[in-house]
Swiss-Prot record:
Protein name, UniProt field: Pyridoxine/pyridoxamine 5'-phosphate oxidase
Annotated catalysed reactions: pyridoxamine 5'-phosphate + O2 + H2O = pyridoxal 5'-phosphate + H2O2 + NH4(+); pyridoxine 5'-phosphate + O2 = pyridoxal 5'-phosphate + H2O2
UniProt remark on cofactor binding: Binds 1 FMN per subunit.
Stored Pfam families: PNP_phzG_C, PNPOx_N
List of residues binding FMN: 60-65, 75-76, 81-82, 104, 139-140, 184, 194
Superkingdom in the source lineage: Bacteria
Annotated family: Belongs to the pyridoxamine 5'-phosphate oxidase family.
Length: 211
């Protein structure tokens, strides 16, 4: 199918160098708040890219759970494909696709594992059914049918009905220590605005990139 004619103009306005804060997280926070105000579906959803031992890139959508000067945090099953790939290569790429606002944010960096205390604190903040689901799924492994998952979920829901769900030993989190951040704002005539932050010591170097 030819989809070459599916296009539109980007008319929401530009991004100017004079308006950029010195710290990329300040602009990220502003854009994320605007994405939330615009009622975008899952504004914290990010495409997480990793690379396997053969050099094959893999992508999946994961929810951002926390960010600060130390980095961006997400949680996952440590037996998952992405966890195995990050064990071999801790380099990572994140993309926030806020298409409705004609924006995207691209982050690169490397991961560090979260402490058990941090993981446990977040795990027990989740709804109980989500905690149980973490026990049910051996992420990225092959299963014969959905019924296998549903039966295991009901079994564990009964088991943990009157008590706390323990933290699975195979469940954890990563902090992405940020190296670069690129902000993209759609512009008229395909002359989009792109600004690229690169970490330099305790600060950031900012460059404008051609669209």
């Amino acid at each position: 199918m030819d989809v070459a004619d599916l296009r539109r103009e980007y008319t929401r306005g530009g991004l100017h160098r004079a308006d950029l804060p010195a710290d990329p997280l300040a602009l990220f926070e502003k854009w994320l708040a605007q994405a939330c105000e615009a009622k975008l579906t899952d504004p914290t959803a990010m495409v997480v890219a990793t690379v396997d031992a053969e050099g094959q890139p893999w992508q999946r959508t994961v929810l951002l759970k926390h960010y600060d000067a130390q980095g961006m945090v997400f949680y996952t099953n440590m037996g998952s494909r992405k966890a195995h790939q990050l064990e071999g290569n801790p380099r990572i790429s994140l993309l926030f696709p806020w298409h409705t606002l004609d924006r995207q944010v691209h982050v690169t960096g490397r991961v560090e594992k979260m402490s058990t205390f941090e993981v446990m604190k977040y795990f027990h903040s989740r709804p109980k059914d989500s905690q149980i689901a973490a026990w049910v799924s051996k992420q990225s492994t092959r299963i014969s049918a959905r019924g296998v998952l549903e039966a295991k979920f009901l079994e564990l829901k009964q088991k943990f009905a009157n008590g706390e769900v323990p933290l699975p030993s195979f469940w954890g989190g990563y902090r992405v220590v940020i190296d670069t951040v690129e902000f993209w704002q759609g512009g008229e005539h395909r002359l989009h605005d792109r600004f690229y932050y690169t970490r330099e010591g305790d600060g950031w170097h900012i460059e404008r990139l051609a669209p």
